[in-house]
């Protein structure tokens, strides 16, 4: 049984309020596209995009678009793939019947060439972005393209720009396989696997898990609501602890206790000395002076204690 491996690439825009299917690339508000590595012939590739993805084979309608698709294919390591152009009796046109207003055939290599069958197809090379004519019976990887949307469609998971809120489908059943959506998708997936790698914890973003089923014909079917988890390894800013300094009141309290001890010693000494010398009045005057100085210090300490600030380290 062939299992299609879905390949994941980046969003290029975070500002437009539109959504793309899960696992696709958003391109300047003009559409979304998705690569499939499993090779199909041209007819079945067209059918797969239309039936399973509700889309069409990608149409590189400009040089900019052509380079965008080529760059994504290079990143994924896909050398050649079907695009949405074909011919009937050597009239080359897009799948919707419109004429090719832009093309990038390898003219130096003699393309486009006449095909041996009545219907021919067009492939694109990621090495130079050039187009080639092929027999439609050949098997190649392919790219589906579809317009962006603002709603969900029957269990398919869309993703939005960072500033937008995601709305999840509510119906469906869970499946054994899960698909993961996060910011750095190239680090979450290898080229031939479905499932998260260990580095998903390093993205620092929400991770969206989407159940999928693999049907008997090998086509992936999306079903069930996504499971949203918060990345437990999201980077956190360390906050320094609050350090409360020793207040002036606390410092003065210890100083006051020391002074009171010294005063009691001085009073005792003065009394003993004054009695011996007969200078009782001098002792009283000195004690009054000391008491006055202590009251003034206490008043100043009270004022300073009201202006104490808690300092933070």
UniProtKB/Swiss-Prot annotation:
GO terms for molecular function: carbohydrate binding. Residues 28-145 form the C-type lectin domain. Disulfide bonds join 49-144. Keywords: Disulfide bond, Glycoprotein, Lectin, Secreted, Signal. InterPro entries: C-type_lectin-like (IPR001304), C-type_lectin-like/link_sf (IPR016186), CTDL_fold (IPR016187), Snaclec (IPR050976). Residues 244-313 are annotated as: Disordered. It is found in: Secreted. GO terms for cellular component: extracellular region. Residues 1-17 form the signal peptide. The keyword Cytoplasm does not apply. It comes from the Eukaryota. Its main location: secreted. Pfam families: Lectin_C (PF00059). PROSITE patterns: C_TYPE_LECTIN_2. Glycans are attached at residues 28, 41, 213, 279, 300. PANTHER family: PROTEIN CBG13490. This is C-type lectin domain-containing protein 162.
């Amino acid at each position: 049984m062939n299992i299609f491996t879905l390949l994941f690439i980046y969003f290029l825009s975070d500002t437009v309020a539109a959504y793309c299917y899960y696992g696709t690339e958003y391109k300047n508000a003009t559409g979304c596209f998705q690569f499939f590595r499993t090779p199909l012939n041209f007819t079945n590739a067209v059918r797969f995009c239309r039936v399973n993805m509700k889309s069409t084979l990608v149409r590189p309608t400009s040089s900019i678009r052509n380079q965008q698709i080529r760059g994504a294919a290079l990143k994924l390591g896909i050398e050649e793939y079907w695009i949405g152009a074909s011919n009937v009796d050597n009239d080359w046109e897009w799948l919707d019947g419109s004429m090719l207003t832009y093309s990038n055939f390898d003219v130096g290599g003699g393309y486009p060439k006449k095909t041996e069958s009545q219907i021919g197809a067009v492939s694109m090379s990621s090495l130079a972005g050039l187009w080639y004519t092929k027999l439609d019976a050949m098997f190649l990887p392919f790219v589906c393209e579809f317009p962006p949307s603002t709603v969900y469609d029957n269990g398919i998971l869309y993703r939005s720009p960072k500033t937008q809120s995601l709305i999840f489908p509510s119906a469906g059943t869970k499946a054994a396989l899960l698909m993961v959506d996060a910011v750095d998708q190239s680090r979450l997936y290898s080229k031939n696997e479905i499932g998260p790698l260990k580095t998903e914890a390093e993205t620092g973003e929400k991770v969206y898990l989407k159940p999928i089923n693999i049907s008997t014909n090998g086509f992936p079917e999306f079903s069930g609501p996504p499971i949203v988890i918060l990345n437990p390894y999201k980077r956190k800013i360390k906050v320094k602890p609050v350090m409360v300094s020793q207040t002036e009141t606390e410092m003065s309290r210890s100083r006051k206790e020391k002074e009171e001890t010294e005063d009691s010693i001085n009073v005792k000494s003065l009394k003993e000395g004054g009695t011996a010398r007969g200078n009782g009045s001098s002792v009283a005057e000195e004690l009054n002076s000391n008491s006055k100085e202590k009251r003034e210090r206490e008043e100043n300490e009270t004022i300073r204690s009201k202006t104490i600030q808690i300092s933070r380290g």
